[in-house]
Amino acid sequence: MRVLPATLLVGAATAAAPPFQQILGLPKKSADTLAKPLHDLQEQLKTLSGEARHLWDEVASHFPNNMDHNPVFSLPKKHTRRPDSHWDHIVRGADVQSVWVAGASGEKEREIDGKLEAYDLRVKKTDPSALGIDPGVKQYTGYLDDNENDKHLFYWFFESRNDPKNDPVVLWLNGGPGCSSLTGLFLELGPSSINEKIKPIYNDFAWNSNASVIFLDQPVNVGYSYSGAAVSDTVAAGKDVYALLTLFFKQFPEYAKQDFHIAGESYAGHYIPVFASEILSHKKRNINLKSVLIGNGLTDGLTQYDYYRPMACGEGGYPAVLDESSCQSMDNALPRCKSMIESCYNTESSWICVPASIYCNNALLGPYQRTGQNVYDIRGKCEDSSNLCYKGMGYVSEYLNKREVREAVGAEVDGYESCNFDINRNFLFHGDWMKPYHRLVPGLLEQIPVLIYAGDADFICNWLGNKAWTEALEWPGQKEYAPLPLKDLVIEENEHKGKKIGQIKSHGNFTFMRLYGAGHMVPMDQPEASLEFFNRWLGGEWF
């Protein structure tokens, strides 16, 4: 069987994945490790229905030049685990689970829900002066360990610059799937960026200006995280996030009492509905979840894929990138694409969802990608294809690969990479890409506010598609929300008071924002506007 690389939604950006690695080039032991899953994949294909086999055959016939290699599976990252004596604190999940309290009826019950026995949290107070990143701000780094499954997730916590005793706590997630949230830290919204001299530069518009922020490298084998196993779908990753937050707030109860929010972008449009639902499913928890924020996310493919042609062909507020012939070819491909996504939604079967992802990405994203235009920002060309179009991403990777940086934060892997393409392919071949995670959003809206924001120059997760899926979503407030017009969003304070930074519509717990002049990474392109809406959202202005 031959398969095709999918388009990659990195947390901060999106690009075509590089060619697959030839498994014959791997060490013999690694090749043997891959043999069984590839054999199982071939065997499963033999059992498919005629319709499902036809979908796979059709994808191969439409894109013969790209269907060159079998999928690969992620290999363990080289690492050296630090001794327990290195860490200031180790929080044992088993200890948390052993705490019983009297319930409302007098019966004993666990103080905190969830299966946490296999998890530990390692914590180290990081010296800010060692790296020069936000000196004076309290920082913690460490790992969440799933000892049962050999998974180790890296996190980096920055306390609020303002009033950490009262300011909210935010978890930030980049996407991919398979891209490090440290990209968001140093390229977008963290306390420092990295310049061309590979030195940290203070960020005046950091999101920890009025909130404490946790940056989490997930799933495993992303960034500084590592494992001997692999995670290949969003649901599995959600269990780890719940464990991390539970143990972190157990160690630091002073933060647990604050409001907590989850924010992320791109493939976090998949992650966040699942992660938030996982948290809310535990009635006895120490996580004070108040809202979620999704920026330029992929959440409802069936609706969003309608809007690649309009965005590429001049209907999104920017000049057309494609000629009429290419626009027509995208129109011609759309009905088949939507039919395949509908089949994926109806079955949620990997054998249906995988070909839908491959066909639709190539038919509707391919024409744009072939122009060389930046898929994250319709206003310009891709400046550095080796770093997903952004030179700054290369600076971040070079910085995080420095030995002194890895030592300062307690990283245990031998090297850092911004995106792990094996993880991306694992999620793709598990069918995760097209699955209907938007169906979880109505359940969230019953309990917490949801913000969908989008930079209006992004192509890959464009504002047209994000606005459309929020309007198409079936929830009790749909009839009131959907027809609402967009209104001006302006800066309320400082010397730029009254400046228009975007548009907004909001009803009940649901809010959509269009941010002017920003691509896929809103905080990078429009830092002032980004911090403006972020602070006002956390302040509860729209809910």
From Swiss-Prot:
What's the protein name? Answer: Carboxypeptidase Y homolog A
The cross-references to PROSITE patterns, in alphabetical order and at most eight, read:
CARBOXYPEPT_SER_SER (PS00131)
Similarity comment text for this entry? Belongs to the peptidase S10 family.
Cellular-component GO terms for this entry = fungal-type vacuole
The propeptide segment or segments lie at 18-124
Location(s) in or outside the cell: Vacuole
**Sites of glycosylation?**
N210, N509
Q: Which InterPro entries match?
A: AB_hydrolase_fold, Peptidase_S10, Propeptide_carboxypepY, Ser_caboxypep_ser_AS
Q: What is the lineage of its organism?
A: Eukaryota, Fungi, Dikarya, Ascomycota, Pezizomycotina
